[in-house]
């Protein structure tokens, strides 16, 4: 991902779960990101897309689950998640229509 022009190629989608929705109150947001992206690229992409100040970025590589099919076993796609903490004075991101 050395020569990515569009930051929307790095940030693929927000993670919609009970845990990620609860972390919004603490200015912590979770996104599914491109597997080859690094923390610096993720930080720059979030700041450009949402026009906020990012404090820190943590990443986690999640392996795909092994699932049974009719003919044997298959594998779900592996994902990379980024847990982004916004700076203290930054405005909240309105992803899910959460109360600010």
Curated annotation (Swiss-Prot):
Keywords: Ribonucleoprotein, Ribosomal protein, RNA-binding, rRNA-binding
Alphabetical list of Gene3D superfamilies matching this protein: 3.30.70.330
SUPFAM superfamilies: Ribosomal proteins S24e, L23 and L15e (SSF54189)
Segment forming the signal sequence: none
GO BP term (any one): translation
Source organism, top-level taxon: Bacteria
MF terms (GO), sorted A to Z: rRNA binding; structural constituent of ribosome
GO cellular component: ribonucleoprotein complex; ribosome
Alphabetical list of InterPro entries matching this protein: Nucleotide-bd_a/b_plait_sf (IPR012677), Ribosomal_uL23-like (IPR013025), Ribosomal_uL23/eL15/eS24_sf (IPR012678), Ribosomal_uL23_CS (IPR001014)
HAMAP family, alphabetized: Ribosomal_uL23_B (MF_01369_B)
Subunit structure: Part of the 50S ribosomal subunit. Contacts protein L29, and trigger factor when it is bound to the ribosome.
Protein's job: One of the early assembly proteins it binds 23S rRNA. One of the proteins that surrounds the polypeptide exit tunnel on the outside of the ribosome. Forms the main docking site for trigger factor binding to the ribosome.
Family to which this protein belongs: Belongs to the universal ribosomal protein uL23 family.
Protein name: Large ribosomal subunit protein uL23
């Amino acid at each position: 991902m050395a020569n990515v022009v569009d930051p929307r190629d790095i940030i693929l989608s927000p993670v919609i779960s009970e845990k990620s929705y609860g972390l919004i109150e603490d200015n912590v947001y979770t996104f599914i990101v491109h597997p080859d992206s690094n923390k610096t690229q993720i930080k720059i992409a979030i700041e450009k897309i949402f026009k906020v100040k990012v404090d820190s970025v943590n990443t986690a590589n999640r392996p795909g689950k092994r699932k049974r099919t009719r003919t044997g076993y298959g594998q779900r796609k592996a994902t990379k998640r980024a847990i982004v903490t916004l700076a203290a004075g930054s405005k909240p991101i309105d992803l899910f229509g959460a109360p600010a």
